[in-house]
């Protein structure tokens, strides 16, 4: 057995539904492509739906399976709407891959309270509440992993 086939048999993701937050960004798109190439069905979730759609088309052209979904992790309604949409389409979520995040390069003395709140709402609060929403689904399924 060749190494690639062996690794795919051990680490393959066939039949697994993976929700990726921040999927259209640089790191998110690379992770999403890798998950799809390992056989996962990837729900590409991000604020820029058009970029998610383009990535889904690129993954499909490479033989993978992906779908695009709008998600703003700083918006609780957006979180629940996205999770509901993914579950409706795939009937399950096996893995949540948290990639969404923002940053603004400013010195400590220059960060405005509004900037700090926006970063924390996305990077901390958003990560917590998308994980909570997906965990509820995973609890119902009696399986799942959050990364």
Residue locations for each model-derived region?
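Substrate-binding pocket helix/loop in short-chain dehydrogenase/reductase
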Residues: 107-108, 112-117
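The beta1-alpha1 cofactor-binding region of Rossmann-like NAD(H)/NADP(H)-dependent oxidoreductases
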Residues: 49-50, 71-82, 113
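Conserved glycine-rich Rossmann-like NAD(P)H-binding loop of the short-chain dehydrogenase/reductase
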Residues: 40-54
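Active-site loop of short-chain dehydrogenase/reductase
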Residues: 16, 64-65, 92-93, 138-147
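A short, exposed helix-loop element centered on a Lys and neighboring polar residues
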Residues: 131-132
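Conserved glycine-rich cofactor-binding loop
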Residues: 24-26, 48
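Conserved NAD(P)H cofactor-binding loop of Rossmann-fold oxidoreductase domains
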Residues: 99-104
């Amino acid at each position: 057995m060749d190494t690639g086939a062996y690794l795919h048999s051990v680490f393959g993701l066939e039949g697994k539904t993976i929700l990726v937050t921040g999927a259209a960004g640089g790191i998110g798109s690379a992770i999403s492509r890798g998950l799809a190439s390992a056989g996962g069905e990837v729900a590409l979730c991000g604020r820029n739906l058009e970029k998610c759609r383009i990535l889904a088309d690129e993954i499909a052209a490479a033989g993978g399976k992906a779908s695009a979904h709008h998600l703003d992790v700083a918006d609780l309604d957006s979180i629940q709407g996205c999770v509901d949409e993914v579950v409706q389409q795939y009937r399950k979520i096996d893995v949540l891959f948290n990639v969404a995040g923002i940053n603004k390069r400013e010195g400590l003395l220059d960060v405005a309270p509004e900037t700090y709140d926006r970063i924390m709402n996305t990077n901390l609060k958003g990560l917590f509440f998308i994980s909570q929403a997906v965990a509820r689904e995973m609890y119902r399924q009696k399986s799942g992993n959050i990364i």
